[in-house]
Design a protein with these regions (language model features):
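Pyridoxal 5′-phosphate
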Residues: 1-143
Length: 143
């Protein structure tokens, strides 16, 4: 066996060339966008989501700071967050579920976890409404 010199001996296998090229393309794309326009779009999505919370009986938003990134962590009474995620997935909607790398916070609120929708500038108001239509359907299914 022949060992290479530092730092090369710690780089086993083929470098992530395709990933590096993809990252470069993503950076170029984002650099061409106006950050303030992205922020306005994301805030509009979060605002619409906040308006629709009341349309889902038993839904509670976890984290309601006035100035926050466009994320919505939530729970629905009587439903486990993993079940919410699975049922949304079956309807073509992706959310994150579980402790979300915040176990001390979940323990503080005595929650088994939450579901979290993340909104980005490329999402649409229609997609936010689809999320809430799906949540209403899920809530009715288990009511």
């Amino acid at each position: 066996t022949t060992y290479n010199t530092l730092p090369y001996k710690f780089e086993a296998g083929t470098p992530a060339i395709a990933e590096a090229v993809g990252l470069g393309a993503a950076i170029d794309y984002l650099a061409g966008l106006e950050r303030s326009a992205m922020e306005v779009a994301e805030n509009a999505l979060l605002q619409r989501a906040n308006e629709l919370v009341g349309s889902v009986p038993g839904m509670t938003v976890i984290g309601t700071a006035a100035n926050k990134v466009p994320l919505m962590s939530f729970k629905i009474d009587g439903l486990h967050p993993s079940d919410i995620g699975t049922l949304l997935d079956q309807q073509g909607i992706a959310v994150r579920t579980g402790h979300l790398c915040a176990m001390p916070l979940m323990e503080f609120y005595e929650l088994p976890g939450t579901a979290r929708a993340s909104f980005a500038f490329y999402n649409t108001l229609e997609e936010v409404e689809q999320l809430f239509t799906a949540l209403q359907k899920i809530q009715r299914l288990f009511a």
